[in-house]
């Protein structure tokens, strides 16, 4: 990682003191934080003074290690204290953590936190959301060139304004409508357009418990036509059907094509989105499941219609996987790499322009949609982060597949030739979207790789993206993303299945399988390095770094025999091995041989690589220098570290309150990491809260840091979204995002304003002294 003297990450403003405590009974919600706890371990945790809250430094190689309890008072009760850890992400453990745990200073209390807080006085004020009658567009040119390798467009424009255009809007209203009226708002935008009789706007409605108007029914699906005079009900009862089912979409497309034949067709998918793995849609009437890409593909195939463009007014759908599906049926594709603000697309202007000239070229249509969307979202709130891109699918079909195949194959060769770190470094630096869905900007990833094959892919992709707009300081969002596993493998099975169904290039499937498998092996072998908890105190018993040991460990684990015991923490009873994979989201399936994607040959072939690219726990020693504790590593050892973050737990006398993860840390003038903790943490309006870093986008001197605070807003589970920028370094609350839990994996479009009179309760996770998650509390 890059180091420089001084603080890293977010700026602090110390503005007061606060307390940390639990109240009431446990909520039974499951973890509201990252779910990792502070891991577990064997071995001594070192001495703690009689108060149970004294200073000591702890270190663990994996988040899956449990901390020891340390000392306790004579009556067995522990007083409050603070446990902090600095998390170092390792190249070799690309899917896990290097955890440095340290306690600095005395944060004593009897169930409360009496130290000072990094108190961000963030006011949660309602934000006005005006809608422009005519969004102001930017004078930025779109790319109108077309590669000679592009296939012929399926839609042929007649020209001269003679084309008839049918626009199909598949509007699954869900809670976006029932709670916030967002679908009604967009229909009103359509109604404000000056429409031509050559433009047919046909809308299927459904999926919402309630519609915020007096026209649309929530009991059944309906079909409407948007006209200058208002909306005309075409089908009062189109059945009570899940809008996430293929047959529902197929029937709608066929209805539109049959009843409103046209020269040009467009399909707009309106709802939540969840990216390549989750796909489109959350239907409140039929809440189980979404429309995954293989289902979307079946719906389009069965419908038998070809489109001028397919667009997603939904989050996270500008992926190569989605584009590959859409390419079979459409010439252009419009979607967002990132989550969309609640305002979504602004419909008035581009529909008016299209009505004035129904032969308007599709690049110009897409540019207007993107410019208006960007302007309208910024007018709603300057903190809205937006991405929207227009992709020429005919060009993608002719230029990308060969380049993509060569890129994937060459990446597998790097992984197989012990150059895994090249791929891991490129992946760790790639722009990532949303949180925990393993979706990254493909062009940025290829640029980071820097191989000839990667450069060729980047060039081909840039040629296909005819227009792309992103908000300020949202760096490295180039218009198309892809699934690439990193810290969470629980979605690998479903993603590989989807790849099989949609015809993803086998070379890329092999690529992510190889990468994930080597990373899984790195996680496993790291558990064998002896207990690193005592390394800060110079009490290591064996380095655990031999290739023979790694080979024996891998063989035992993959065979399920559990025979390795030479100073490692693996055994047939398997608490450490089992805990490791439990903590490593979704990885228990490896042990149970249910991970169909796992390439065991890749894991065992990487034994030498594991041995030669591991940070020896015995080197992780807290050194006292100038009155502070620091971590001294060589430049080569720091090269194995990908990122740094701070994790803090409060000892309330009965267990640990988890305050979350922040990207605040500091290096001294010698570029040694300072381990001392200054007893400060984020607070909202004076109340210390659990905070989780989500993203850190840096572009030169500009940056945008986004984090979340779990809470209950009027009794509903939400995450408050906090945004820190170079212009507003002390942060603001952008709004609240609903957490759906098991109902759907799609991501809510937009944020909820927090209004005066709302009831807000902050949440935190609570752990035993053995590192076991107990419950979540207010």
Give a label for each model feature.
Residues 1-125, 533-569, 576-577:
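Long amphipathic alpha-helical segments used for membrane anchoring, targeting, substrate engagement
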Residues 166-171, 200-205, 265-269, 308-312, ...:
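Structural recognition of the beta-strand scaffold that forms the well-ordered cores
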Residues 1-35, 56, 181-184, 247-250, ...:
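Conserved structured core elements
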Residues 100, 104-128, 133-135, 139-160, ...:
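Terminal, contiguous helix-loop blocks that mediate binding/assembly
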Residues 206-305, 314-315, 320, 337-338:
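Catalytic-core segments of thiol-dependent peptidases
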Residues 2-3, 20, 82-89, 100-261:
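N-terminal extension/subdomain marker
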Residues 171-174, 207, 271-273, 486-488:
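Residue-level signal for short, function-critical loop segments
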